[in-house]
Amino acid sequence: MLPVVAQAQFTFITNADNTLTVTHYTGPPWTVTIPATTNGMFVTSIDGVFGNSSGKPGLTGVTIPDSVTNIGFAAFNSCYSLTNVTIGNSVTSIGEFAFGYCTSLPNVTIPNSVTSIGQNAFENCTSLTTAAIPDSVTNIGGAMFQLCSSLASVTIGNSVTTIESDFTGCTSLTNVTIPDSVTSIDGAFENCISLASVTIGNSVTNVGDYTFQSCSSLTTVAIPDSVTSIGSYAFNGCSDLTNVTIGNSVTSIGNWAFRYCTNLTNVTIPNSVTSIGSAAFFRCTRLTKAFFLGNAPSGDTTVFNGESGTAYYVPGTLGWTNRFGGWPTALWYQPTPKILGSGYGLGATSNGFAFTISWATNIPVVVEACADLANGNWCPLATNTLTSDTNYFNDSNSTNYPSRFYRIRSP
């Protein structure tokens, strides 16, 4: 327990549960230890007592006891000289702007008791170099580490579900792994100009607007199959991006999503994509080929605006004309045949099972079937030479088998 004189330097209010909240401090500013109890009552909350450094410009260190469960709104906001913080092991919530603009704070340990961290909690802590969000944290507010320009390493706990603009302007951050607990990232890493590597977890469904805008060091990105939408400006200005893999569940690519990705040379659009926004690939100056695996998505004449290239589409897919997105179109041929996984002719018929073969003009194709993959006994059913873009095949004997598998090959 602190001496009586030291405790008298704090002002408290009594909470409904007979605990105390610190509301004011009048003592010397250098290093402060907040009492755990006073007059037999536990101190459980800190409410803006040091915020905006009102009379506390020299506060360099603070110890928060284990009795405290809540660090309130702007509790230490703009304590510019603060270099050391010890957070007690009972804190469950860190409020909005709690340590914002503590520009001398080099590191902070967030205990495993914390479950919620508010918006802008560590915004503009420009000396902060590392940060770890523990697995106990389920909710983080937007802009949590925004403008932490020295932050080079961050660990995101496995219970976080949403990341908003939490790392915007973290210009020293070089790599990040987004855990599988996260379902949405929205504007999270905008202007992280040193970010060279990112791993997106397999539960993310939305890569929101501006998420990786101006990440000019990012060279490759794999968007997992869990993602259904890529927002506007999501990768705008990623000038070093040379390779992007778009997952097979993406249905929409937003306006200007890959604008000014000046080192991107080709892109493959999966058959799940139904819409591409205006200028999605505007000024991708090295992009000369776009490969489409499915039917023609909706998109205006500006999709590839400003550059020259060709949009290639798979034979047998629908909706294509002689131009798409401002580019001429052409059939996409491959040296080996392929069974189209969607579109016309796939599935049971009145007298068998049918599918369409594509990508193998003017070469012979053998269709084989197997009733049991365990024994691997593949039997030839037909040999055809594709004289056009596609060939329709129907197995009239498929109804004689409880299950049947198919493959095609060139003899």
Where are these regions (language model features)?
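Short, composition-biased motifs enriched in small/polar/acidic residues
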Residues: P3-H24, F292-N295, T301-T302, Y312-P411
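Glycine-centered signal
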Residues: P3-V5, T115, Q119
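Structural signature of tandem-repeat unit edges
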Residues: N15, G27-T44, G55-N70, Y80-S93, ...
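Hydrophobic residues on conserved beta-strands that form the core of alpha/beta folds
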Residues: V22, V43-I46
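Consensus positions within tandem repeat domains that build extended binding/scaffold surfaces
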Residues: G48-V49, G72-N77, G95-Y101, G118-E123, ...
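Intrinsically disordered, low-complexity coil segments
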Residues: G51-G58, Y344-G347
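BRCT (BRCA1 C-terminal) domain core and associated BRCT-interaction motifs
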Residues: N305-E307
